[in-house]
Amino acid sequence: MQDQYSRTQLLLGKEAMEKLHNSRVAVFGIGGVGGYTVEALARSGVGALDLIDDDKVCLTNLNRQIVATRKTVGQYKVDVAEQRIHEIDPNIKVTTYKIFFTPETQDQFDFT
């Protein structure tokens, strides 16, 4: 386990950290709740993340979304989140989907 997760490992134990590292989590929507969720998952040691959102950062997101800064306005939220994740841990596998998950689009996703 990487040193950056050593404090978490003290709390959870080695076996739990290995489970986190081997886990894959999909997050639907990288806005007010999803953005913070992605950040927490990355900082917790989850090994793979699927990010699903077709929205771009806009000015009205600045007061409430972690992916929103003046620099990121106009960028896809999944791209901003992926960059942030890799700044936290470059070894996390990130798959981005620039599409909204709906009954009509569900066949375009592979979560196996």
What residue spans do the PLM features occupy?
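Glycine-rich phosphate-binding loop and adjoining beta1-alpha1-beta2 segment
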Residues: 46, 51-89
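A structured beta-alpha segment of the ubiquitous adenosine-cofactor-binding alpha/beta core
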Residues: 74-112
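N-terminal charged helix/coil linker that caps or initiates catalytic domains
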Residues: 1-26
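Conserved N-terminal Rossmann-fold NAD(P)-binding element of oxidoreductases
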Residues: 27-29, 52
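Hydrophobic/small residue at the entry helix of a nucleotide-binding pocket
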Residues: 33-34
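Aromatic pocket-lining residues of Rossmann-like dinucleotide-binding sites
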Residues: 41
